[in-house]
From Swiss-Prot:
Family annotation (InterPro entries): Cation_efflux, Cation_efflux_CTD_sf, Cation_efflux_TMD_sf, CDF/SLC30A
Biased composition (Low complexity): 11-26, 41-55, 105-116
Keywords associated with the record: Ion transport, Membrane, Metal-binding, Transmembrane, Transmembrane helix, Transport, Zinc, Zinc transport
Homology family: Belongs to the cation diffusion facilitator (CDF) transporter (TC 2.A.4) family. SLC30A subfamily.
Single GO MF descriptor: zinc ion transmembrane transporter activity
Job description of the protein: May be involved in zinc transport from the cytoplasm to either intracellular organelles or extracellular spaces.
GO cellular component: contractile vacuole; pathogen-containing vacuole; plasma membrane
Source species taxonomy: Eukaryota, Amoebozoa, Evosea, Eumycetozoa, Dictyostelia
GO biological process: defense response to bacterium; zinc ion transmembrane transport; zinc ion transport
Domain of life: Eukaryota
Entry's localization field: Membrane
Compositionally biased spans, kind Gly residues: 130-140
Name of this chain's protein: Probable zinc transporter protein DDB_G0283629
Length: 543
């Protein structure tokens, strides 16, 4: 029970067994005092300091149960009817000896009548909690920050212990390394290893008289050229947009990858021609032992390069944060991601969340196409090295089977060409402004059509500026009574959260405007009406 008094100061500490009395000092000349009944199952003397951050207008009974296994065990029964927006701080010193005295110093804004129910926000800090309704489970040090607002939701941030944070810092720095830097470092390291080994292969292939080894060395030469080209493309793609290149130079990466693929195809054609010549005109003796040693070393180097480039391409990058975001509805359960059909315009005055913050959805890793093209080169070299090892083993055991050398060259040349098909398709898809393969146009159109107030979706175009940078333009026809700004906000939210498209151009149209708009073309000009001459009116009748 709480008694509110205006324009007078009361401080009434009361000490009762199994009862606690609160004295409240309010700076805004609104005062109240209330008694709380506690059932404490604690025979120990504990001194606790509880700091809460509340924003409320409140009049409440506390009737809830907490069982904390850190410094004390007690039962509190609290009944909360939360609906408040006020800020107050509790400095409570509790003596648990079945007789409790509570001194509370509050700075609040209270504008309520007696016996009025309140809704409030809580800020809790639990150290090492294992049990309880809001503890995260597990021992050790665990911090919780809770914000409960009037049944509309709550946010939880669960942080790990300080020791865990210190231990995970180097790993997090490695994971969070800028993708561009990671790609550049991987290319430089792979380029250095490849150059050193290429020189060794050229010398070894010359003395072994092996076309397969010389073929592998030639592949390494194209790898080096492709890596230099990739580094140049990455450098120029970082240049800002200009007046003549409004999208910037992002597609330089795509051009570099395309040229790299064409280099592989050209070199493979030359090697196939040489292999056919060796089949028709067999060479002199081939040293299978030297071939095997060099091919084994080549395979080892290529595997190292492949691991480095796969790491640098960022194809499986993950971002692991230390916190969790939850939203709790009126029923108290966790509210999952809204379904597409529920993202409707139910409230004209609703707020649209900031989608660019740190708590937004983590994007899945997008691989760097230049590093990936170099990775394809190295992967082809791995196949080539395996082929050389097979041929060298055959020639080592049976020296007269020299034909195994060009045959393996032909077989693995075809395999190398096969590894470039996907990269070639991706490069051409971006240059031809095709729809990104991970996005379904019909699904996007259906999601936009489900927005309440949208009557039609047309002129939908989706393309990629470069890999991982999709763009979209669309026309949305809406009802005349709907606010266009709300439709625009909801459409952008759907596109960003579900499809990770943040470069959008959305045109909102009313029905009259839509009638003049056609897909993919402007309305044709209206034909001019022909004037019909009337001879009877132009010349007087003959008499």
């Amino acid at each position: 029970m709480e008694n509110f008094k205006n324009n007078e100061l009361e401080s009434s500490p009361i000490i009762n067994k199994n009862n606690s009395s609160h004295s409240i000092n309010n700076e805004d000349n609104n005062y109240y005092s209330h008694n709380l009944e506690h059932n404490d199952n604690n025979n120990n003397d504990n001194n606790n300091t509880i700091t809460n951050s509340h924003i409320n207008n409140h009049d409440h009974k506390h009737n809830h149960e907490h069982e904390h296994k850190h410094k004390h065990n007690h039962d509190h029964n609290h009944d909360h009817d939360h609906n408040h927006e006020e800020e107050y701080g509790h400095g409570n010193e509790l003596e648990h000896n079945n007789d409790q005295e509570h001194n509370v110093g509050n700075k609040n804004l209270l504008t309520n009548n007696n016996n009025q129910s309140k809704k409030k926000k809580h800020g809790h800090s639990h150290g090492g909690g294992e049990d309880g309704s809001s503890s995260g489970g597990g021992g050790g040090r665990h911090g919780h920050g809770h914000s409960h607002g009037g049944g509309s939701g709550s946010d939880h941030n669960h942080g790990s212990s300080d020791e865990d944070d210190e231990e995970s810092k180097p790993l997090n720095q490695l994971r969070n390394l800028d993708s561009k830097k990671k790609a550049r470092y991987s290319l430089i390291l792979a380029l250095t290893l490849t150059t050193i080994f290429m020189v060794g292969e050229i010398v070894g292939g010359y003395f072994a008289n092996s076309l397969a080894i010389m073929t592998d060395a030639a592949h390494l030469l194209t790898d080096i050229g492709a890596m230099f080209l990739s580094l140049f493309a990455m450098w120029i793609s970082q240049h800002p947009p200009t007046s003549s290149m409004s999208f910037g130079f992002h597609r330089a990466e795509i051009l570099g990858a395309l040229v790299s693929v064409l280099m592989i195809w050209a070199l493979t054609g030359v090697l196939v021609y040489e292999a056919i010549q060796r089949i028709l005109y067999p060479p002199d003796a081939v040293d299978g032992k030297i071939m095997f040693i060099i091919a084994s070393c080549g395979l080892f180097i290529n595997i190292i390069d492949a691991i480095i480039l796969h790491w640098g391409s960022g194809g499986h990058g993950h971002s692991h944060g230390g916190g969790h975001g939850h939203s709790h509805g009126i029923g108290g359960g966790t509210q999952k991601k809204k379904s597409k059909k529920n993202r409707l315009l139910n409230n004209q005055g609703q707020d649209i969340e900031d989608l660019g913050g740190e708590n937004g959805k983590n994007k899945k890793g997008v691989r760097n196409i230049n590093v990936h093209s170099a990775y394809i080169h190295v992967l082809g070299d791995c196949f080539q090295s395996i082929g050389v090892m097979v041929a060298s083993c055959i020639i080592w055991v049976h020296p007269h089977w020299k034909i195994a050398d060009p045959i393996t060259t032909l077989i693995f040349s075809v395999i190398v060409l096969g590894t470039t098909i996907k990269l070639l398709r991706e490069s051409l898809g971006v240059l031809m402004e095709g729809v990104p393969p991970e996005i379904d146009v019909s699904e996007v159109k259906g999601d936009l059509s489900e927005i309440e107030g949208v009557t039609e979706v047309h002129d939908l175009h989706i393309w990629s500026i470069t890999l991982g940078r999709p763009a979209l333009s669309v026309h949305l026809t809406i009802l005349p009574t709907i606010d266009p700004e709300e439709i625009l906000s909801i459409a952008n939210k759907i596109l960003l959260e579900d499809y990770e498209i943040n470069h959008t151009t959305i045109q909102i149209e009313k029905p009259l405007v839509k009638d003049k708009c056609k897909d993919h073309s402007c309305p044709p000009p209206k034909p001019k009406k022909k004037k019909i001459k009337n001879d009877n009116l132009s010349s007087p009748p003959n008499q």
